[in-house]
């Protein structure tokens, strides 16, 4: 006769089951900068498609710009899994809004305020969502662009950038942005910013998407690459002239 030993449950399995599930305590797979601007017809947003596992460029096909409802566009840098969690929150929010069927829909300002409260709430629980979010949109003919940090700090502006782009792209935008930008000029300005980030940010890759939102809706471009030039002398010997270098 075959006998089987049955382990005695001392209650540990119940304790494990009852423990609250944990989210990201430290970022693992992250995306780099998002750059967004207002232009005369709406909002443009650019991001590359890289996902870094620590310092290793592990994934090269991650979309970090998503349409939210009818009037909004969301981009995120930081932890990819937390961005997916935020998208689940927003799916639930827009579903509940649509269930009212009252002819109204959430605009970009409402979604921006909602995300601000979500990020601040998670920060107060010492379990933040490890992202910086960019929210753009158009409703009733008015363009809207704002940003939320991982600790719930939010603001609106005519152009925003996250991550390394906040240091390298914003100076370019301050010099060259103006309110009457056409779509073509806006795309060229974003491509200039993304090219600078590609040269200087180790986490950036030469595969990007540019999304547009207007009163007509959201359009996200197919992934494409920028023309680059790597023959600058400083690229061949980046430490030349620095103290202690050869």
Swiss-Prot record:
Main location: cytoplasm
Any one cellular-component term (Gene Ontology): proteasome complex
Protein keywords: Cytoplasm, Nucleus, Proteasome, Zymogen
Gene3D superfamilies (UniProt xref): Glutamine Phosphoribosylpyrophosphate, subunit 1, domain 1
Tissue distribution: Ubiquitous low levels, higher expression in siliques and flowers.
Residue numbers annotated as active site: 24
Keyword Repeat found: no
Positions of the propeptide segment: 1-23
Subcellular location: Cytoplasm; Nucleus
Family: Belongs to the peptidase T1B family.
PANTHER family: PROTEASOME SUBUNIT ALPHA/BETA
Role summary: Non-catalytic component of the proteasome, a multicatalytic proteinase complex which is characterized by its ability to cleave peptides with Arg, Phe, Tyr, Leu, and Glu adjacent to the leaving group at neutral or slightly basic pH. The proteasome has an ATP-dependent proteolytic activity.
Complex formation: Component of the 20S core complex of the 26S proteasome. The 26S proteasome is composed of a core protease (CP), known as the 20S proteasome, capped at one or both ends by the 19S regulatory particle (RP/PA700). The 20S proteasome core is composed of 28 subunits that are arranged in four stacked rings, resulting in a barrel-shaped structure. The two end rings are each formed by seven alpha subunits, and the two central rings are each formed by seven beta subunits. The catalytic chamber with the active sites is on the inside of the barrel.
Protein name: Proteasome subunit beta type-4
Species per Swiss-Prot/TrEMBL record: Arabidopsis thaliana
Lineage of producing organism: Eukaryota, Viridiplantae, Streptophyta, Embryophyta, Tracheophyta
Encoding gene, per UniProt annotation: PBG1
């Amino acid at each position: 006769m075959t006998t089987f030993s049955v382990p005695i449950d001392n209650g540990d399995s119940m304790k494990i089951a009852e423990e609250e599930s944990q989210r990201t305590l430290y970022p693992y797979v992250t995306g780099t900068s998002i750059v967004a601007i207002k232009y005369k017809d709406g909002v443009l947003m650019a991001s590359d498609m890289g996902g870094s596992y620590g310092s290793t460029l592990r994934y090269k096909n991650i979309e970090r710009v998503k349409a939210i409802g009818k009037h909004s566009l969301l981009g995120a840098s930081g932890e990819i899994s937390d961005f997916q969690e935020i998208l689940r929150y927003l799916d639930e929010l827009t579903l509940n809004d649509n269930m009212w069927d009252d002819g109204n829909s959430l605009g970009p300002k409402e979604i921006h305020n909602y995300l601000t409260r979500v990020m601040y709430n998670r920060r107060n629980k010492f379990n933040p969502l490890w992202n910086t979010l960019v929210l753009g949109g158009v409703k009733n003919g008015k363009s809207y662009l704002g940003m939320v940090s991982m600790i719930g700090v939010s603001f609106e502006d005519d152009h925003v950038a996250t991550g390394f782009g906040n240091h390298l792209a914003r100076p370019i935008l301050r010099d060259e942005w103006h309110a009457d930008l056409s779509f073509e000029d806006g795309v060229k300005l974003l491509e200039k910013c993304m090219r600078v980030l590609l040269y200087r940010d180790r986490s950036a890759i030469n595969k990007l998407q540019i999304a547009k939102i207007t009163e007509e809706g959201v359009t996200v471009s197919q992934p494409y690459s920028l023309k680059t030039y790597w023959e600058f002398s400083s690229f061949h010997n980046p430490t030349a002239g620095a103290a202690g270098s050869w």
